[in-house]
Amino acid sequence: RRLWAEGRAEAIAPYVPEAVFPLYREAHAAGQYTDFSAAGRCELALLRSACRGETPFGQVRGISEGLEHRLEAAVRASTTYDELLDALTTVRYPRARMRRLAMDAALGYAADSFPSLPPYLHLLGGRKDALPFLKGCSLPASHSLARLRESGEACARMAEAQLAAADFGALCRVSPEAMGSLLRQKNIFLT
């Protein structure tokens, strides 16, 4: 990630399969990667806008042991995303956990936002000759998130959460993209 963020797509060549490296080079040239500075500002802005009411983060997924108060105080005092994470991180609460907690709060993921197990199989790519195996799945399976979203209440909740995260990611790219790109994403078939 560090090599990629420093703007050197060629530096990651030894770490990715040779056959797909042209896709990485193309994505880098098009700005289809995260601008972490923009992502931090966007996340902090979402957290600040959610910082209303008596316990604004009380229902966030993963909140326990008074973390909602710690998160609220950190959001109110921080001017950068790194300051926010520094204020949240302790020996007891590692930075990775606090990063996930802050993102869940920014995206509005409540404890009951998701079912305990994935309600569908979102097919991103595969081999055409393997598609018949999907007929034996007990879960709905499709490349279309719009179709999966219509497969029941649990699927709709999960798809909306997936769309929120994808839209956040699309906004925080070096070359930002419009909302809903995940709904227009094409399946990749290998031959």
What do these predicted regions represent?
Residues 1-191:
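Active-site cores that bind ATP or allylic diphosphates and position pyrophosphate for catalysis
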